[in-house]
């Protein structure tokens, strides 16, 4: 049978549908059950819809102020974002006064029981006005519904329209309370549609060229965006807008002027690429820059689209000369090592082939927290025989996978990292990274370096137990 019930799930037999063992002879439609509510009793690693909107999509915007309409807990949760560094450079050549503004500040309404009983809309209005005065450099305000305000029915959109006129700035209401969907993926969708309907097409870029692209679903985790931008600059391609890494609020307004959209994170941001194509006839291309061969292939595809493949070839040749010798050394050190890829969504199908084909590793397990069926179809095609594919894994399953499949290293998020360490297994952060960037040629080299350093660290020789003992 292709589906597996872990021993720890004996009391939750429904989990069997979420765990799939890859077999070549299985029908294509055999996939883990996904994008459904977490089964009661599971200690899920998922985030909520609000986290998907603020923590992924809008949290990377450099000049926006965020007002969380919630009790203080959700505001604190909204502050715990990924490492999305931002520069001070603005599209018109000016400098935004605060570097990494998006990482430093967040505001909230701090709802109390009284606000829940009598409504919190007046408090939200006061908070937006006060926050705008406290941070006059912010060019826009984004406000968010949460579970509490979604349940009591506060109309954050009406408040946002009213306050926008009063303060003279865009106030964008993101209506993605935590319960809006089974995973943070619903928050991605809501934020995509909200930003498209409220912003796209409302302003023009300062300069346009024949080689303008939107880089969509690239959030500049630990500088990923800046790596890709350098490639494109060397090819003569202008990144007109990013969605939303190191972007300013106004960049989203002129996305409709690009000649092509490149969609990097296809789970969180294909929505807006489709909308741009439908309404403004901006075609989009799904791209993958993790690993050497994928990066080569997608740079060439972009160059060929604009009729400049020779420029892509030059970029590829230059980078391969720089990283080739060290990659070969690290391949020799990592070959045969077992790896478990445990990320939110697309990295689970971006990484298995590069890890196996380019570093000689063996991917023994892949698990995601919010992937959809189309993503699992890609995962299934890209992993080897007997690979374990798990949807919405819980903490006890994590322990059982470590015990039974003995990965030498896990690529995961912060929530899983320290549990893995306690079980004696090295772990490299694949969400926010250790020593990124991890994208592109030099990024893949950084990832290989971090895996090598983690696996061969002498600290593991000091442990008094092994996983499973």
Curated annotation (Swiss-Prot):
Any Pfam family the entry gives: Oxidored_nitro
Keyword Metal-binding tagged: yes
UniProt-recorded Gene Ontology molecular function terms: ATP binding; iron-sulfur cluster binding; metal ion binding; nitrogenase activity
CDD domains, A to Z: Nitrogenase_VFe_alpha
A GO biological-process term: nitrogen fixation
EC number per UniProt: 1.18.6.1
Recorded superkingdom: Archaea
Free-text comment on the cofactor: Binds 1 [8Fe-7S] cluster per heterodimer. Binds 1 [7Fe-Mo-9S-C-homocitryl] cluster per subunit.
Keyword Oxidoreductase: yes
Residues that span the membrane, as ranges: none
PROSITE patterns recorded: NITROGENASE_1_2 (PS00090)
Binding site residues for [8Fe-7S] cluster: 48, 74, 147
Residue runs in coiled coils: none
Cofactor: [8Fe-7S] cluster; [7Fe-Mo-9S-C-homocitryl] cluster
Binding positions for [7Fe-Mo-9S-C-homocitryl] cluster per the UniProt entry: 265, 431
Keywords: ATP-binding, Iron, Iron-sulfur, Metal-binding, Molybdenum, Nitrogen fixation, Nucleotide-binding, Oxidoreductase
Reactions mediated catalytically: N2 + 8 reduced [2Fe-2S]-[ferredoxin] + 16 ATP + 16 H2O = H2 + 8 oxidized [2Fe-2S]-[ferredoxin] + 2 NH4(+) + 16 ADP + 16 phosphate + 6 H(+)
Classification via PANTHER family: NITROGENASE MOLYBDENUM-IRON PROTEIN ALPHA CHAIN
Subunit structure: Tetramer of two alpha and two beta chains. Forms complex with the iron protein (nitrogenase component 2).
Record function comment: This molybdenum-iron protein is part of the nitrogenase complex that catalyzes the key enzymatic reactions in nitrogen fixation.
Family: Belongs to the NifD/NifK/NifE/NifN family.
Listed name of the protein: Nitrogenase molybdenum-iron protein alpha chain
Organism, scientific name: Methanothermobacter thermautotrophicus (strain ATCC 29096 / DSM 1053 / JCM 10044 / NBRC 100330 / Delta H)
Gene transcribed to yield this protein: nifD
